[in-house]
Amino acid sequence: MLVGAHESIAGGVANAVDRQLENGGNCGQIFTHSPQVWQDPSIDDTDAEAFRDRSQMHDIGPWVIHSSYLVNLCTPKDDLRAKSIDSMQQEVDAAAQLSIPYVNVHLGAHTGAGKQQGLDNAISALDELTIPDSVTVLLESDAGSGTKLGNKFDHLAYVLEESTHELEVCLDTAHVFAAGYDLSTPAAVNTTIKEFDTTVGVDNLACVHLNDSKHACGTNKDEHAHIGEGKIGESGMEAFINHSAIDPIPLVLETPNENGKGFAWNIDRVQNLAENPA
């Protein structure tokens, strides 16, 4: 199976590969810079080559670049829209430089413009990007707090259908659960995946952010928990991981580092649940 974690690039992007190895992962995700500021990736060619070489040497991949948290594709504000498009262009270019196939992005919030206008804003912003042939932009499912979009499967389906680009989806289990799609039992997992397939299509699913949730289903609260120890729980996580539609998809953990448990513990947990289904 493909399972890994979101790794730091501190000291150079190639160090993310070493950190992934230490945690026992074989795929993963990075930020190219602090996600809390507007900043260029600024990855030099030597470091990029080292990242590519180490990833190939250790057979780690696919990798995903997660875009800045400041990006808001749904915004009605011209200045924020321009910054968001510029930031995304830099991310897809960095992905090509690093031979990373995916750039993940949240649609953002419509901040009062309304759902339809927000989705249309996101589509037109994405359509302004020049995406390298080797890179695919992934729309991440959202927990849906405030006016954020992407919390409903039909939001994702609409953007996929209307954009001029060939986009795909990253499903975050904690976000989906928070948005009201139950994953806490095997039956609920089957229902949710069936609804996703009917609305979006599992053939459009390129990556999963595998996270448990500290909050109940439908609360729209985005706070991640250790695998099997949150409100989704062991039964739901086990059923999700072992579902035939999910089995070939890269699973990227964004679980907490707390209570003596970090990425290594959570990766091991996922592997055990996959190897020893109930």
Curated annotation (Swiss-Prot):
Residues binding Zn(2+) 2, per UniProt: 140, 172, 209, 254
Free-text comment on the cofactor: Binds 3 Zn(2+) ions.
Protein residues bound to Zn(2+) 3: 175, 222, 224
Gene field: nfo
Organism (species): Haloquadratum walsbyi (strain DSM 16790 / HBSQ001)
GO biological process: base-excision repair
Keyword Lyase annotated: no
Taxonomic lineage: Archaea, Methanobacteriati, Methanobacteriota, Stenosarchaea group, Halobacteria
Reaction(s) catalysed by this chain's protein: Endonucleolytic cleavage to 5'-phosphooligonucleotide end-products
Protein name: Probable endonuclease 4
Protein family per UniProt: Belongs to the AP endonuclease 2 family.
UniProt-recorded Gene Ontology molecular function terms: deoxyribonuclease IV (phage-T4-induced) activity; DNA binding; DNA-(apurinic or apyrimidinic site) endonuclease activity; phosphoric diester hydrolase activity; zinc ion binding
Enzyme class, broadest EC rank: hydrolase
Keywords: DNA damage, DNA repair, Endonuclease, Hydrolase, Metal-binding, Nuclease, Zinc
UniProt EC number: 3.1.21.2
Required cofactor(s): Zn(2+)
Residues that, per the record, bind Zn(2+) 1: 66, 106, 140
Pfam families for this protein: AP_endonuc_2
Function as written in the Swiss-Prot or TrEMBL entry: Endonuclease IV plays a role in DNA repair. It cleaves phosphodiester bonds at apurinic or apyrimidinic (AP) sites, generating a 3'-hydroxyl group and a 5'-terminal sugar phosphate.
